Design a protein with these regions (language model features):
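C-terminal/domain-terminus segments
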Residues: 156-165
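Conserved catalytic segment of ABC-fold P-loop ATPases
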Residues: 154-157, 170-172
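Terminal amphipathic alpha-helical/low-complexity segments used for targeting or macromolecular assembly
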Residues: 1-62, 180-194
Length: 194
């Protein structure tokens, strides 16, 4: 089994030992760099967004990502319709990241599917793991949020700025903290606010 196959199955894998993974990482970094350069030029905004569509595994209508943006592979990211990510987004997508429709992501957010074992000997061997992240539809993620490997965020949830999401968050709640936890349901009264 290749290191890439292990990665995609959620097993420990060594990315530095797989020429395919190394080549894909390098190609993705070059594409991200190209996107970031074009997106800062007024005449390059449209071509930058087209680059994103080629980079990502799947993207619905209304895709908008502000530069700078970085990801590991790109092909392992799927975004629904009307996806918006503000400046400074990072998606480490080895385990796969899926966003539903109408998702808003604040500035300086990170989605990290990759992690290293707690065992120092395994880390010294260059091993890591990757677990998928799933973000439902209608989710708003505030600035500076970090989402850790294997987490799911339910439809309509709001994640407060600065949170570190280490466990699943149910649908329809306001969640906050380090570690992030549900604070309260989003109610009809919340829908009355501007």
């Amino acid at each position: 089994m290749t290191e890439k196959e292990k990665m995609l199955r959620g097993m420990l894998y060594a990315p530095a030992r797989d020429e395919t993974l190394l080549a894909e990482l390098a190609a993705c970094k070059a594409q991200c760099q190209q996107f970031n350069q074009r997106a800062y030029q007024a005449e390059g905004i449209e071509s930058a967004q087209m680059l994103l569509r080629r980079l990502l595994g799947a993207a619905g209508e209304g895709l908008r990502i502000e530069p700078p943006f970085w990801c590991d592979y790109g092909w392992n990211i799927s975004v629904g319709r009307n996806f918006y990510m503000n400046h400074g987004g990072v998606i480490l997508d080895a385990g796969g990241v899926t966003f539903g429709d109408n998702v808003l992501v604040g500035p300086q957010c990170g989605f990290y599917t990759s992690g290293q074992p707690l065992d120092a000997a395994k880390r010294a061997q260059g091993l890591e793991y990757a677990y998928p992240i799933r973000v439902g539809s209608g989710v708003w993620i505030g600035g500076g949020v970090r989402v850790m490997p294997g987490v799911s965020i339910g439809d309509g949830a709001v994640i407060a700025s600065g949170s570190v999401v280490t466990k699943d968050i149910p649908a329809g709640v306001l969640a906050a903290g380090v570690p992030c936890r549900p604070i309260r349901p989003i109610t009809a009264a919340d829908r009355m606010l501007p």
